[in-house]
Amino acid sequence: MFRIEYSLVQLLLRNVTIPLLLIIQMHIMSSVKLIQIRIWIQYVTVLQMFSMKTKQ
C-alpha cells in the first residue's frame, strides 16, 4: 500500500514538476524581455533628451 502511494506521489510530482518548470521558465523569459524592453525605452528616451539638449 505504502509503495503504491509512493509511486503515485512520484508520478504526480513528475507530472506536476515539468509543467511548473516550463511555466517558470516562460515567466522568467517574459520578465527578462520586459526588463530588456524597459531598458531599451529608457535608453531611447535618454537619447531623445540628449538630442533635444544638443539642438538647443
Swiss-Prot record:
Keywords on record: Secreted, Signal, Toxin
Tissue: Expressed by the venom gland.
Domain of life according to the entry: Eukaryota
A cellular component term, taken from the record's GO annotations: extracellular region
Acetylation is among the record's keywords: no
Signal sequence annotation: 1-31
Cellular localisation: Secreted
A single MF term (Gene Ontology): toxin activity
Protein task: This synthetic cationic peptide inhibits the development of Plasmodium berghei ookinetes, kills intraerythrocytic P.falciparum, and is cytotoxic to the Drosophila S2 cell at micromolar concentrations. No antibacterial, antifungal and hemolytic activities have been found at micromolar concentrations.
Family according to the record: Belongs to the non-disulfide-bridged peptide (NDBP) superfamily. Antimalarial peptide (group 5) family.
Protein name: Meucin-25
Organism, scientific name: Mesobuthus eupeus (Lesser Asian scorpion)
